[in-house]
A protein has these predicted regions:
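Active-site neighborhood of phospho(di)ester-bond hydrolases with catalytic His/Asp-centered motifs
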Residues: 10-13, 34-39, 43, 60-65, ...
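Residue-level preference for short coil/turn positions at secondary-structure junctions
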Residues: 4, 29-30, 55-57, 112, ...
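P-loop/Walker A phosphate-binding loop and immediately adjacent motor/lid segment at beta-alpha junctions
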Residues: 29, 83-92, 160-162, 172
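Beta-strand-turn-beta hairpins that frame and shape the catalytic cleft
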Residues: 2-9, 109-116, 158-163, 185-188
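Conserved catalytic scaffold of divalent metal-dependent phosphoesterases
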Residues: 16-19, 50-53, 57-146, 150-153
């Protein structure tokens, strides 16, 4: 399987936070391919700015669970109070055009030797068994699987396949910093960001 010949930026879990997005905006100009692994919305108030910026400047974008909850009006009874509150707020703020644009986003992308998703059935993928399930979804020549959702950095190698979660550029969880990932050739680097939003 071929290595990644392009300079690739992988980031996830922006959650409508303009300040976090501005941290990586300069990086977008220095890469050949930019990938966003979902959760553009939720928690933050910078909905319009983040939707416009990501849709205009990022090459490959998948739908996250926070976008899906905001545009499909699914039942929120099982969600945490802060998730319910932010989803209801987001539903009120989205325009019909924005909802249409978000509805057009796929939940999975296969691009060259890459597989991109936010998660599998909204599960938190955190262990070897979870990562191997992602590998099972990878098609023939696919080498990389990128996902988000947990806000935690993951780099897992299995039979020449690589599973990567770049973490969250807004807020890390379980001791992880805010971060994104850069890939060039065989080099994979997590870039940690300062500050908590």
């Amino acid at each position: 399987m071929s290595k990644c010949a392009k300079r690739v930026l992988v980031f996830s879990d922006l959650h409508a936070n303009k300040r976090a997005l501005l941290d990586i905006a300069p990086v977008l100009k220095k890469v050949d391919l930019s990938i966003f692994c979902g959760d553009l919305l939720g928690y933050g108030n910078d909905i319009d700015y983040c939707i416009n910026f990501v849709l205009e400047n990022v090459d490959l974008i998948v739908l996250g669970d926070h976008e899906r909850m905001a545009i499909t009006h699914e039942n929120l009874d099982g969600q945490l109070p802060e998730v319910r509150a932010s989803t209801i707020y987001t539903r009120c703020k989205l325009s019909p055009k924005q909802k249409e644009l978000l509805l057009s986003l796929p939940t999975e992308i296969w691009h060259e030797n890459l597989y991109i998703t936010h998660s599998i059935n909204d599960e938190y993928l955190r262990n070897k068994e979870d990562f191997e399930r992602l590998c099972e979804k990878m098609r023939g020549g696919t080498r990389y699987a990128f996902f988000g959702h947990t806000h935690e950095q993951v780099l897992y190698r299995h039979n020449e396949r690589i599973v990567l979660n770049p973490g969250s550029i807004t807020k890390g969880r379980r001791g992880f910093p805010r971060s994104y990932a850069l890939i060039h050739g065989d080099n994979i680097e997590f870039v940690n960001l300062e500050g908590i939003f």
